[in-house]
């Protein structure tokens, strides 16, 4: 499921409101066949702001949950302001929006607990995490967890188990462990440290490893990705490697043997910047125990966002926000082979699949 932002564009390194004003969309992409195909597209609020994990898909593919971190100001459509909307989309009979609730300002990464009973949303602008009970494809507000700093910038969020989740804080450079006990959610007093501006979070299907992109200060230096050992407590950062500039896209293969990392490189820099580049990059890393080893890479488009694997791990798509396309690759464990990009009517900004 691809959430597509139609209200935000980048011009000469600056994010501005798109003209003319059109609706954000959500596209259903069939990854079971090659080449992948867009099966349906409907209007659903979405945003490029925040990690590209603002989409969660039920394991049975019957519904999806999409958050929206920004929107156009109703009083001034040339201004982009924080949003708090979270939409539930029925995928089995439509697709169609069946519910819309509010989380917190800057609602971004969203995840469903493994047992399907709890949904968490990181509220990037206000420094909180919203919790919802999930019953019959309906969200019921449960709690809002204050992280203690309104500028914490909670960004990436992922469940490790039904009782534990991780949330990255790119505003103050740490990762919190959230403890879940029934209806009570608390912040573990010991944060994790990975790097400067920890952002996108992913957890392997095995539940033993998590990965986080460290976006850095945005000063055109090489940035990093870290691995966190979550196989036993206390959790601990065990690997950090240099990957390139602005590693926003991040996802484990379904079998956990590879980590895909999308770096934007200099594709969002101002014209004339010595760091401007014509392409971003997709890199594939083999997961060797608790370390990473690069095995393949290929160019992608400008301002790349989410990454998704087909269930068998052989097809990979990458969102190109500026080109409004999905880059398509085949991966055999050793090399990436590019296919024909898929056109998307709005800027593809976040991706979710029914599998990790």
Label for each model-derived stretch:
Residues 1-356:
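Predominantly soluble domains enriched in secretory-pathway, periplasmic, or organellar proteins
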């Amino acid at each position: 499921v691809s959430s597509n932002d139609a209200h935000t564009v980048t011009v000469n390194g600056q994010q501005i409101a798109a003209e003319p004003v059109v609706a954000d969309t959500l596209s259903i992409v069939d990854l079971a066949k090659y080449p992948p195909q867009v099966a349906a597209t409907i209007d659903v609020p979405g945003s490029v702001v925040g990690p590209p994990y603002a989409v969660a898909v039920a394991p049975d593919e019957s519904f999806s949950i999409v958050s929206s971190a920004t929107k156009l100001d109703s009083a001034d459509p040339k201004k982009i302001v924080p949003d708090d909307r979270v939409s539930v989309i029925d995928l089995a009979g439509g697709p169609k929006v069946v519910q819309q609730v509010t989380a917190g300002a800057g609602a971004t990464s969203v995840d469903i607990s493994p047992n399907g009973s709890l949904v968490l949303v990181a509220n990037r602008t206000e420094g909180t995490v919203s919790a919802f009970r999930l019953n019959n494809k309906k969200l019921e507000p449960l709690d809002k967890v204050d992280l203690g700093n309104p500028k914490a910038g909670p960004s990436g969020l992922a469940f490790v188990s039904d009782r534990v989740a991780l949330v990255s804080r790119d505003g103050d450079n740490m990762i919190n462990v959230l403890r879940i006990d029934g209806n009570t959610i608390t912040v573990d007093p010991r944060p994790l440290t990975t790097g400067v501006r920890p952002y996108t979070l992913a957890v392997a299907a095995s539940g033993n490893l998590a990965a986080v992109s460290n976006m850095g200060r945005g000063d055109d230096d090489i940035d990093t990705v870290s691995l966190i050992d979550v196989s036993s407590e206390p959790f601990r950062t065990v690997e950090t490697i240099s990957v390139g500039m602005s590693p926003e896209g991040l996802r484990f293969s379904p079998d956990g043997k590879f980590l895909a990392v999308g770096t934007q490189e200099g594709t969002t820099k101002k014209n004339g910047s010595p760091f401007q580049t014509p392409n971003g990059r997709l890199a594939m890393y083999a997961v060797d125990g608790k370390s990473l080893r690069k095995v393949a890479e290929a160019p992608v488009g400008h301002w790349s966002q989410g990454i998704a694997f087909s269930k068998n791990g052989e097809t990979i798509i990458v969102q190109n926000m500026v080109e409004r396309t999905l880059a398509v690759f085949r991966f055999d464990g050793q090399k990436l082979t590019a296919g024909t990009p898929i056109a998307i009517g709005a800027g593809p900004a976040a991706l979710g699949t029914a599998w990790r």
